[in-house]
Swiss-Prot record:
Name of the protein in question: NAD(P)H-quinone oxidoreductase subunit J, chloroplastic
Similarity annotation: Belongs to the complex I 30 kDa subunit family.
Topological category with respect to the lipid bilayer: Peripheral membrane protein
Subcellular location(s) per record: Plastid, Chloroplast thylakoid membrane
Domain of life: Eukaryota
Listed InterPro entries: NADH_DH_suC (IPR010218), NADH_quin_OxRdtase_su_C/D-like (IPR037232), NADH_UbQ_OxRdtase_30kDa_su (IPR001268), NADH_UbQ_OxRdtase_CS (IPR020396)
Function: NDH shuttles electrons from NAD(P)H:plastoquinone, via FMN and iron-sulfur (Fe-S) centers, to quinones in the photosynthetic chain and possibly in a chloroplast respiratory chain. The immediate electron acceptor for the enzyme in this species is believed to be plastoquinone. Couples the redox reaction to proton translocation, and thus conserves the redox energy in a proton gradient.
Length: 174
């Protein structure tokens, strides 16, 4: 009896994490994991790197036509890196447009994620910044190179395990 109660409690908790987008992705048989809602009520989903392209295309077809932001962060020293996508459904009569947040976690030893540049052009500079600061390689990105740091810079400055060089070479800005 206790096992049945534990299973039903887990199902209730899992259903509390699912929103409209998660239910729609389940209907479309697209792999993801619901992570719940943030403090503003935005649904958050985890997607594996190998499933990102199919999920992103489906979300674009569903109406998420605007990539509001893409960012990255270092989960923990020596741990995974995360790439985060904030998508918005922009249409003519939306006072409160629907939003969704997609998180992709990759190991720091092989941080490769497919680029969404071909779906949302606004990913161009944002993916480049994530590459420059964290070393996440966005496979298929047409201009993936450093955007903030000099081309010859060694390392990824926003990683938690980054060791700051002893000196910096000052360069002219022109």
């Amino acid at each position: 009896m206790a096992q049945l109660e534990n299973n039903s409690t887990l199902l209730v908790r899992e259903n509390e994490l699912k929103g409209l987008v998660s239910n729609w992705l389940i209907e479309m048989k697209l792999m993801h994991r619901p992570l719940g809602f943030d403090y503003q009520g935005v649904e958050t989903l985890e997607v594996k790197a190998q499933n990102l392209t199919s999920v992103a295309i489906a979300l674009y077809a569903y109406g998420f036509n605007y990539l509001r932001s893409q960012c990255a962060y270092d989960v923990s020293p020596g741990g995974d890196l995360a790439s985060v996508y904030h998508l918005t459904k922009v249409d003519d009569n939306a006072d409160q447009p629907q939003e969704v947040c997609i998180k992709v976690f990759v190991p720091r030893t092989k941080p490769i994620i497919p680029s969404v540049f071909w779906i949302w052009k606004t990913a161009d500079f944002q993916e480049r910044e994530s590459y420059d600061m964290f070393g996440i390689y966005y496979e298929g990105h047409p201009h993936l190179k450093r955007i903030l740091m000099p081309e010859h810079w060694i390392g990824w400055p926003l990683r938690k395990d980054y060791i700051t060089p002893d000196f910096y070479e000052l360069q002219d800005a022109y």
